[in-house]
């Protein structure tokens, strides 16, 4: 086995003919492409619905299965890293995503598409982690999470806006939703080819066997999340409790949760350790993430209803919003790094700034719900929203790392992902959708001299107003709440060899 390299930053898996200065940039580019990929792309939703004759809820369900798939590999990532080489992992992830994209174009079954989207999301995170974990010393030579996470979220959260923007334009140019799938299939094959040519197999430690991995636990938690997403995604379509599928899935949720909980409590190496749930500040942290998702879910229902149903903007017109969101995300992530590393201010004040940005979005949208609004007027509110979301996601992830020891941190990321990766967002979207329908029906029933457009405007303004009140109350709570890191000196990321030895001791001791 080759010796572990010491000294300046190196990438020993790279072949000698690759210039050292561009080696880390190659992996950053690979991570960028991985984050663009998926199983189904929401930007092509109207074309997918028309071509496959399926409902909007079906396409949304397929997309959300991919989002859930992205969340589930976290507890397995280091086990994969210490069993396979970087070359093997990247080639496998790229080929798996390429296969899923190709199969999605020729599959008409919604359940199969959901499965393919989940698998694509699973390998998407595996590929991204393997790329960025190998350049972290280049990104921060001191293994500082307060530098690494803002830069990481520039790619991860930023590409959540770039991917639909690219999808909309490719679909418009080629007049087919296949365009993005072919583009991502080609991008993944390009990654596999470049990794095959530019790298070689390199191990920095003796490989660990893939034993004691709780695959069934992963399946149970995934099934639970998918069932919850199903309920609130299809709730309006089935008229909630009136639909038999809704009642069946509602019954399945506690059953699945029971089996997942019992497996977690009674096996030696569970998917999520019971101890990971016992940190006293974890529940408030999850509550803050849920709050952000509540405020951030208004664009999916209220803003889209306003721009499409009232202003009648098309997909190409509103695609510019994705670029504004991308700019807000980059600025928010960089602001977190500036706040922590340069200003060295409290976490509470940072989260307060983020919440003020989210509140600014809601207030501006409340005031702007008028017919005849030009599209440029929405740029500042959208920028404020994504700026605030980026602050919350980045700062709270840093705080989570401070809260939990490293052996539980990646489990914590999955637990946080239960909230931020589609589940709570879908719940909030379902609530907003039901509330909007209720307010529209109520305003029509009042027999006021309003036409349909005016009724929609009044209903939207009512819901934006309620959200403003909720955000204002929470802002007041933040102003009197003090959140500081668990320790004065923030932790550093351990070396991968140290993590590997820790995992080996845990496996040998049976703990």
Enumerate the language-model features and the residues they cover.
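Central cavity-lining transmembrane alpha-helices of secondary-active solute carriers
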Residues: 61-79, 125-132, 323-336
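Helix-loop-helix hairpins in multi-pass membrane proteins, especially solute transporters
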Residues: 74-78, 82-215
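Transmembrane-helix exit segments and adjacent C-terminal regions of multi-pass membrane proteins
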Residues: 2-16, 449-511
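Helix-breaking motifs and short loop linkers at transmembrane-helix boundaries and internal kinks
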Residues: 53, 85, 106-112, 123, ...
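Membrane-interface helix caps of multi-pass secondary transporters
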Residues: 15, 19, 37-55, 59, ...
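12-transmembrane solute porter fold
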Residues: 23-37, 42-43, 271-439, 463-471, ...
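Cytosolic juxtamembrane N-terminal segment immediately preceding the first transmembrane helix
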Residues: 1-37, 50
